[in-house]
Each structure stands twice: as structure tokens, then as C-alpha cells.
């Protein structure tokens, strides 16, 4: 018996060879993981598209508008279908605002039996319903139309019943009182207006109002006459002074002020312009407007002169010229001095008065007959 060698199979090996069945080998672990990942990808591709857009299953009114990446929003009266905007059906459904992804329009409202159609539904507006005649819609319960109430025997109808408001009634006593009051007011108002018109006509105030409208009303109605009244008082005092020989010549009895007159006795237009040039250096800038209002110019005239004057320093001179042209020959240096005193610019008044006398163009009244020792009479320090 030969011993088994490397090339001679043993009996057990031969037996295993007889029972061996060819088939699949067991898969390695790595290939098993790859197969599992591929299976998950297939399942995701199958099920996710089915549930990705649940908005199509909701009613049109509850769908959220979603941005369409391919185009802008659909206009009112349209809805989005297959990427295109399509119109709603007239009288059936509508959309009142622009939308991005509504896949259907909103159905129009159908009016209930107790209401009638006020405005029919179109592609952009829903149906508007209102209550039938004899009924009204209460604000607290608008879904139901209620019957209009009737006024009792002791009441009068104040407002009639409308589809949106009930009838309002008021007692006959109160109604009679209001009716009488309305009649009295209707009678008295024309009478008062007529009496007022007659008073305005008889007093001549309408002429002043007409002049005020043409020239522009002043802020203070009394300021226009203040300078003239002051000058009239001074002239009256001067007349009394002439008849009183015991009073110092050239001074008034009441105030002690003196009137300035041109030396040559002629028209003082050039002399006034000479004084106007000096005023721009003496009168403070903040007092220019008040001074001109005191002299009688309106705010509109003041602003117009300022706008037309290029150099600020020339504005007062131009305003004084405007006043002189408007006043005419009655304008005098005494008006200017009175106005300066009225606006509390006494220092400027005294300097201008002293300058006018020293210039030789003006002198105090009656100074030629009885000259005073000092230059210009009395000078204030």
C-alpha cells in the first residue's frame, strides 16, 4: 500500500469532491453597502416627486402664492396654469390681486335669498350684495337682513331706511323745536347781512377795503395813520404857538418839539433824498421794516423793494423813495422823525434831525425871524 503523496488525493478529499455543488459565492461587505445605497436612491426618486407639491391638493383660496422662477406674477383676473397665465371666467370666478402660483380662480359669491345683486361678479371683483327694499344690514350681523323699524305716532322720520342703515325717528316735540330754530336762523342771517352791508355802504368803509385789496392790507390797520395824526398834532400845536408870544419861538406848546422846514422854502424832494442817503447809516437794519410800516408801506411793498434792490444797504433808501412817491408832496422830514420816534429809535431821530439842520438844507420853523444861538436850536447828546 502506497503512502499518500502530494499528487494523490486522499479518500476524504475525494468524498468532498463528490458532494461539491457549484453556485454563487457570498458577496463581500463592500459590494453589499453599494447595493443598499443604490436601492435608497431609487426609492427617493420614485416617492419624492409625488409628495413635493402638496399645494395642488389645497383649495385655491388657501394656497400660498409661490414665486414662479420662469416668469413674473399673473395679473388680477388671471391664474397660473402649466407655466402660463390664463384668464378667469366672467361671472363665474375671479382673482382680485396679482398672484404667482394660484392654479385656479376663486368662485364668485352667490347672493342669499334676502339680498339682491348690487354689483355683478367679474374676473377681478367679487359679487356685491345688498338687502332688499324694506330691510337693512346691521353692522353687528351683516349676514342677515333685518326689517326696517317704523316710527310711532308721536315720532317724525328723521332719516329714511336704507339697505345699510335703519330708519331714524325723533319725537315730534323735538322736531318742531329744531324746525322753528332752522326757520329763525334762515330769517335772521339775511337780515344781519343786509344791515351789515348798509352800514358798510353808508360809512364808506367799502372804499377803504377796496383800496386795501388793491394795495395790500397792512398788519396793523392803525399804523398807516399814526404818522399823519402825529404830524397834525404838531402842526396844531405850532399854530397855537404862533398866537402865544410868551412861548419860546419855534417850539410847540404841547410837546416842545420843533418842526423842520426847507431853508429855500421850495419843494423839498431833493432835500429829502439827501436825508434818505444818511438814514441808511444811522437807522439800525433791524428797524427798517418797522419804520417803513409805520410810514405806511405794506409788507408786500417792503418785500418787493428789497427783492428789486441788489445792494442791501440801498434797500432803506429805495423804500423811503417808494414812500415819498406814494405820499406825494405831503411827505416831509417831520413824518420821518415822528415815525422814528414811534418805533423807539429816538437816537437815530436826534442824529438825523441834527444832521438835517447842520447841512443847511433844513431849519426850524420861525428860526429865520428869531434865530437861536446854538446851531440847530437845541441839540441832544
Curated annotation (Swiss-Prot):
**Which regions of this chain are Extracellular-facing, per the record's topological domains?**
53-180
Q: Spans of TNFR-Cys repeats, please give.
A: 26-86, 87-129, 130-169
The record ties this protein, via Pfam families, to: Death, TNFR_c6
What InterPro entries does the database record attribute to this sequence? DEATH-like_dom_sf, Death_dom, TNFR/NGFR_Cys_rich_reg, TNFR_10, TNFRSF10, TNFRSF10_N, TNFRSF10A/B_death
Q: How does it sit in the membrane?
A: Single-pass type I membrane protein
Annotated disulfide bonds: 74-85, 88-105, 108-121, 111-129, 131-145, 148-161, 151-169
Annotated Low complexity bias: 236-247
Q: Where are the transmembrane segments?
A: 181-201
Q: In which tissues is it expressed?
A: Highly expressed in heart, lung and kidney.
A biological process term (GO) from this entry: response to endoplasmic reticulum stress
Cited PROSITE patterns: DEATH_DOMAIN, TNFR_NGFR_1, TNFR_NGFR_2
Reported modifications of this chain: (Microbial infection) Glycosylated at Arg-293 by S.typhimurium protein Ssek3.
What is the name attached to this protein's record? Tumor necrosis factor receptor superfamily member 10B
Question: What's the source species for this entry?
Answer: Mus musculus
Amino acid at each position: 500500500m502506497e503512502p499518500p503523496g502530494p499528487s494523490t488525493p486522499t479518500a476524504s478529499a475525494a468524498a468532498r469532491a463528490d458532494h461539491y455543488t457549484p453556485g454563487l459565492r457570498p458577496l463581500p461587505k463592500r459590494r453589499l453597502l453599494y447595493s443598499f445605497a443604490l436601492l435608497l436612491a431609487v426609492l427617493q426618486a420614485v416617492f419624492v416627486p409625488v409628495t413635493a407639491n402638496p399645494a395642488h391638493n389645497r383649495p385655491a383660496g388657501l394656497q400660498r402664492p409661490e414665486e414662479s422662477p420662469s416668469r413674473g406674477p399673473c395679473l388680477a383676473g388671471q391664474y397660473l396654469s402649466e407655466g402660463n397665465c390664463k384668464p378667469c371666467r366672467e361671472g363665474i370666478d375671479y382673482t382680485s390681486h396679482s398672484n404667482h402660483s394660484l392654479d385656479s380662480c376663486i368662485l364668485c359669491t352667490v347672493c342669499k335669498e334676502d339680498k339682491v345683486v348690487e354689483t355683478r361678479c367679474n374676473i377681478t371683483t367679487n359679487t356685491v350684495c345688498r338687502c332688499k327694499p324694506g330691510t337693512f344690514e346691521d353692522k353687528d350681523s351683516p349676514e342677515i337682513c333685518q326689517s326696517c323699524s317704523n316710527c310711532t305716532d308721536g315720532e317724525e322720520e328723521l332719516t329714511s331706511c336704507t339697505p345699510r342703515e335703519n330708519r331714524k325717528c325723533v319725537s315730534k316735540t323735538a322736531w318742531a323745536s329744531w324746525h322753528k330754530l332752522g326757520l329763525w336762523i334762515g330769517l335772521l342771517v339775511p337780515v344781519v347781512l343786509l344791515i351789515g352791508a348798509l352800514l358798510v355802504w353808508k360809512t364808506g368803509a367799502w372804499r377803504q377795503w377796496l383800496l386795501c385789496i388793491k394795495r395790500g392790507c397792512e398788519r396793523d390797520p392803525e399804523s398807516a395813520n399814526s404818522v399823519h395824526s402825529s404830524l397834525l398834532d404838531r402842526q396844531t400845536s405850532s399854530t397855537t404857538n404862533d398866537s402865544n408870544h410868551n412861548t419860546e419861538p419855534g417850539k410847540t406848546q404841547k410837546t416842545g418839539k420843533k418842526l423842520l422846514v426847507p431853508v429855500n422854502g421850495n419843494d423839498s424832494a431833493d432835500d429829502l433824498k439827501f436825508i434818505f442817503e444818511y438814514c441808511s447809516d444811522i437807522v439800525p437794519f433791524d428797524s427798517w421794516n418797522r419804520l417803513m410800516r409805520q410810514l405806511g408801506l405794506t409788507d408786500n411793498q417792503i418785500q418787493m423793494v428789497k427783492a428789486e434792490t441788489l445792494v442791501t444797504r440801498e434797500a432803506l433808501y429805495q423804500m423811503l423813495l417808494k414812500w415819498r412817491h406814494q405820499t406825494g408832496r405831503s411827505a416831509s422830514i417831520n413824518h420821518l422823525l415822528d415815525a422814528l420816534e414811534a418805533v423807539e429809535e429816538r437816537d437815530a431821530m436826534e442824529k438825523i434831525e441834527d444832521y438835517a439842520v447842520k447841512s443847511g438844507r433844513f431849519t426850524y420853523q420861525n428860526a429865520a425871524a428869531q434865530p437861536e444861538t446854538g446851531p440847530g436850536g437845541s441839540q441832544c447828546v
